[in-house]
Curated annotation (Swiss-Prot):
Assigned protein family: Belongs to the replication factor A protein 1 family.
MF GO annotations: damaged DNA binding; enzyme binding; single-stranded DNA binding; single-stranded telomeric DNA binding; zinc ion binding
Keyword Cell membrane found: no
Native source species: Caenorhabditis elegans
Subunit relationships: Component of the heterotrimeric canonical replication protein A complex (RPA).
Biased composition (Low complexity): 196-207
Gene name linked to the record: rpa-1
Function of the molecule: As part of the heterotrimeric replication protein A complex (RPA/RP-A), binds and stabilizes single-stranded DNA intermediates, that form during DNA replication or upon DNA stress. It prevents their reannealing and in parallel, recruits and activates different proteins and complexes involved in DNA metabolism. Thereby, it plays an essential role both in DNA replication and the cellular response to DNA damage.
Keyword DNA-binding: yes
The protein, known as: Probable replication factor A 73 kDa subunit
Length: 655
């Protein structure tokens, strides 16, 4: 077998710090580009075999499977380079590292996945083990450009270059001991950037230069890790990349301007920095996200964890004498640290800042503008998130984030949300965003590939739980109405407690099941008649139209007692089987049919999810029950619950 000869030109073109580094993410980049992306890619051969043929007018002589360390993909060798393939066929085996210099995306016909048709390559090295990284599990690429759109991993997967051992040693020697009379060489920057298309200026701080090239300048001396910043360190100095920059906010009460940003060092530790008024205005125009800075001087205080999810115990308040200097390149790219909470567990973190890694199942096509209760104009946009827990959760984007979000950038993509807040409402849970929220599309962290695999292969057969609805009813043993009343269930919680009962509607008043509500978006105030029109006291305006809304009161009964409950909105619509608008139309046009609907609801056993809360009215404390869910009775499950209750009572009796 002929040896592989590497000359200085090839070495200089393809090495990174004297080693061979795979161009991670190159397969995705090429597929997005519909072919050769404008720069060569270093990949590894996983297998190869002779397979002559012709498809759709393209002749080929050899088939290989390649890996860029993150994605694996199939490729055909074009018959145009048949002579080269014959000379090197014994090298095109598992472990060989090659450079792709010319290729195109090849359509293999209906029902078959596309592949690369290689028309130019260079063998660089042989006899390597299959190169991978513990940070990501290699996966087969589907060939769909949108599946991982924009994914450009910074993962380093490299190996020594035995065929260029002498040149690599010379390179390392030159880098460690540069000639004193000469300025530092710039070739490395060109070589290191070879493996990837040139990054925009704003992201250059992410590059990973060789440590041997960095010398301790006056600027770098005295730099401490961000993790060591405390109020007890009087003269701190840190170096990191601005990983988040917020907009300046103005608080009208005192006309105070506030500017927040977060800085992350190469260890992955992050600290929040805050500036006020003139300092805020000055820094806002200076600080650029994704660039690195040296920062010294400022007051260190306890972090407010309600608004700060950096994980640091402290935060920095910058003063007029604080010094911020451009930081050049970091020794290592800052790591994204995600303190992940699965969606199925968010109920235990209500009101706290958490991080989630999810697939966006769907989102509103457009942002919605509405008026808040305080009369403020707001913009929001909702999306539904899912992860391996099988829980589906709604998340709301606000303001500019809601407006600029593109469906193609989110839907069916893995997204990391840092600093979102679980909120409880009506027994269900959703996620809210705020100024501390950071959104990272297809992050370069462990778990992304696994989540993609779960979404593609497991999720279609998974029973999804909607966390934004009242939770807990499906697995909780039912209670009795008398039991809830006697124990004053809900008295120990300001927000009330939730319980499930098996009961039936025994009395309902159709007359008061609906009311005419304000037609304004987001307002549900009951209208009052005024001069033939309607008036909303909340919005302080008259209108000639309204919307029907549910406020349905009825009696529930089981074998132990009766109680009056109230159902609103979606819960009432599920009970009746019609929207409020549909029922309102019958109310006006067909009163008999309208009344018949309520008659049919009575004396049908159902499983009711109730919120029980103690309420004060006219100096009298009473229990108020509201419906948050209703389902048909699963007889098998109900019988099993009854058996468990009997066993528990027998155990109590024996004791």
């Amino acid at each position: 077998m002929a040896a592989i000869h590497i000359n200085h030109d090839v070495f200089n073109k393809y090495h990174t710090n004297g080693k061979l580094r795979l161009t991670t993410g190159y397969v995705q980049e090429a597929i997005e580009n519909n072919g050769y992306p404008g720069h060569d890619g270093i990949v590894q051969v996983l297998k190869g075999k002779v397979e002559q043929g012709e498809q759709l007018g393209h002749a080929f002589t050899f088939r290989i499977r390649i890996s860029d360390g993150v994605f694996q993909y199939n490729a055909l060798m074009s018959a145009d380079i048949d002579d080269q393939i014959k000379r090197e066929v014994e090298h095109l085996v598992e472990g060989t590292i090659i450079a792709l210099t010319k290729f195109e995306i090849y359509d293999q016909g209906e029902g078959a996945k596309n592949c690369f048709l290689i028309k130019g390559y260079k063998i660089l090295s042989r006899y390597h083990q299959v190169l991978t990284s513990p940070e990501v599990k290699p996966r087969s690429h589907s060939g769909k450009p949108d599946e991982h759109k924009g994914y450009r991993p910074n993962i380093i997967i490299e190996d020594v270059w035995p065929e260029a051992e002498g040149m690599a040693a010379d390179y390392q020697e030159n880098m460690a001991n540069p000639p004193a009379a000469k300025a530092p060489k710039r070739e490395f920057g060109e070589e290191a950037s070879y493996n990837r298309a040139a990054a925009p200026e704003a992201t250059r701080a992410r590059a990973v230069p060789p440590p041997a090239r960095r010398t301790a300048s006056n600027t770098e001396r005295g730099v401490m890790p961000i993790a060591m910043v405390t109020p007890y360190v009087s003269n701190f100095k840190i170096h990191g990349m601005v990983s988040r920059k917020e907009e300046i906010r103005t608080f009208p009460a005192k006309n105070t301007k506030v500017f927040n940003f977060e800085i992350t060092d190469s260890n992955g530790d992050t600290i929040r920095c805050t500036a006020f008024n003139e300092v805020a205005e000055s820094l806002y125009t200076t600080i650029t996200e994704n660039l690195s800075y040296y920062l010294s001087g400022g007051s260190v205080k306890q972090a407010n964890k309600k608004f700060n999810n950096t994980g640091h115990d402290y935060e920095i308040t910058l003063r007029s004498d604080s010094i911020i200097e451009a930081g050049g390149e970091l020794l290592a790219a800052p790591k994204l640290i995600l303190k992940r909470v699965k969606l199925g567990e968010i109920a235990g973190y209500a009101g706290q800042l958490i991080d989630v890694l999810v697939v966006v199942e769907k989102m509103d096509p457009e942002a919605t503008e509405f008026t808040s209760k305080a009369g403020k104009s707001l913009i929001k946009r909702e999306m539904e998130l899912i992860d391996e827990s099988g829980a589906l959760v709604r998340l709301t984007l606000w303001g500019d984030e809601a407006t600029k979000a593109l469906v193609d950038d989110y839907v069916q993509k893995v997204i990391a949300f840092k600093g979102v807040i679980p909120r409880e409402f009506n027994g269900g849970f959703s996620l809210g965003t705020g100024s501390a929220t950071r959104i990272i599309s297809v992050p370069e962290i462990a778990g992304v590939s696994e989540l993609y695999d779960w979404y593609a292969n497991v999720k279609p057969t998974t029973e999804v739980k909607m966390m934004s609805q009242a939770a807990g009813g499906s697995n909780e043993a039912p209670r009795t109405i008398a039991g809830l009343q006697e124990m004053q269930f809900g008295k120990d919680s300001d927000k009330g407690d939730y319980a499930t009962v098996k009961a039936m509607i025994t009395r309902v008043n159709p007359t008061n099941a609906l009311y005419r509500g304000c037609a304004s978006e987001g307002c549900q105030k009951k209208l009052v008649g005024e001069n033939g029109d309607y008036r909303c006291e909340k919005c302080n305006k008259n209108m000639n139209k309204f919307k029907w809304l549910y406020m349905m009161q009825f009696e529930l009964s089981d074998e132990t007692g009766q109680v009056y409950v109230t159902a609103f909105g979606d819960s009432a619509a599920k009970i009746v089987g019609k929207s409020a608008a549909e029922l309102g139309e019958l109310h006006d046009e067909s009163p008999d049919e309208y009344n018949a609907i309520f008659e049919r609801l009575q004396f049908v056993p159902k499983m009711w999810r109730l919120r029980c809360k103690m309420d004060s009215y006219n100096e009298e404390v009473r229990q108020k029950m509201t419906v948050y869910g209703v389902d048909d009775v699963n007889q098998d499950k109900y019988i099993e619950n009854l058996k468990q209750m009997i066993e528990q009572m027998q155990q109590m009796s024996d004791y």
